[in-house]
Amino acid sequence: MSGTTETQLRDLLSSMHLRHRFLGVFDKSFPGFLDPHVPASAIVNTGSRASGGMHWIGFAFDPAAGRCYMFDPFGWSDQKLWELYRVKYNAFMRRTGLRQPDRCFTLVRSTEAVQCPCSAACGLFSALFIVSFDRYRSKPMDGNPVIDTVVGVKHENMNSPPYRDILHRNQERTYYWWTKNSAYFRAHQEELRRETALNALPENHV
């Protein structure tokens, strides 16, 4: 098995005692952020629950700022997400917008990769973003001590050895961060490291 399960991600984030409303872990049928008054977040898979899932992405909504954040550890565009996973998030974005007093919000999304394609750690990176949103709601995508654990790499550089090394270091730093900050991760780190390991998906190295 490669990657983190729904249960593992829920338990990992439960160990962080989040102060905002973490809605949970969902497959691609996530309904959206339907309460226009409450800061909330979720981890959403690009696949269906029946398929076993494919790739985890972190989402968060800050109603005070009128912003929805989308943290994809690969930073893929909508077009690339469709090419790779046959998934679109238009429906839940639309439902979120319709619940807002003025029926609009700003989408802020990651555009660079922090994860190597050979890795199965998308869930751990997405969970790191959820903690970043919890602690630094005004700047969850960069510029705070949680999310700056990782460094973004432009897509055209992802398979260049020096930049691949950066992505590999991101994963090691993320393991270290979770070890330091989560009792759940410490108790289950052998299993979590094994299931999310670098080179778990070596065929994705080109």
Curated annotation (Swiss-Prot):
Q: Which InterPro entries match?
A: Papain-like_cys_pep_sf (IPR038765), Peptidase_C5 (IPR000855)
Q: List the molecular function annotations (GO) for this entry.
A: cysteine-type endopeptidase activity; DNA binding
Q: Which UniProt keywords apply?
A: Autocatalytic cleavage, Disulfide bond, DNA-binding, Host nucleus, Hydrolase, Late protein, Protease, Thiol protease, Virion
The reaction(s) catalysed by this protein are: Cleaves proteins of the adenovirus and its host cell at two consensus sites: -Yaa-Xaa-Gly-Gly-|-Xaa- and -Yaa-Xaa-Gly-Xaa-|-Gly- (in which Yaa is Met, Ile or Leu, and Xaa is any amino acid)
Q: Does the keyword Iron-sulfur apply?
A: no
Q: What induces it?
A: Expressed in the late phase of the viral replicative cycle.
Q: Per the UniProt record, which EC number(s) apply here?
A: 3.4.22.39
Activity regulation as described: Requires DNA and protease cofactor for maximal activation. Inside nascent virions, becomes partially activated by binding to the viral DNA, allowing it to cleave the cofactor that binds to the protease and fully activates it. Actin, like the viral protease cofactor, seems to act as a cofactor in the cleavage of cytokeratin 18 and of actin itself.
Q: What class of enzyme is it?
A: hydrolase
> What is known about what this protein does?
Cleaves viral precursor proteins (pTP, pIIIa, pVI, pVII, pVIII, and pX) inside newly assembled particles giving rise to mature virions. Protease complexed to its cofactor slides along the viral DNA to specifically locate and cleave the viral precursors. Mature virions have a weakened organization compared to the unmature virions, thereby facilitating subsequent uncoating. Without maturation, the particle lacks infectivity and is unable to uncoat. Late in adenovirus infection, in the cytoplasm, may participate in the cytoskeleton destruction. Cleaves host cell cytoskeletal keratins K7 and K18.
Could you describe the subunit structure of this protein?
A: Interacts with protease cofactor pVI-C; this interaction is necessary for protease activation.
Q: Which family does it belong to?
A: Belongs to the peptidase C5 family.
Q: What is this protein called?
A: Protease
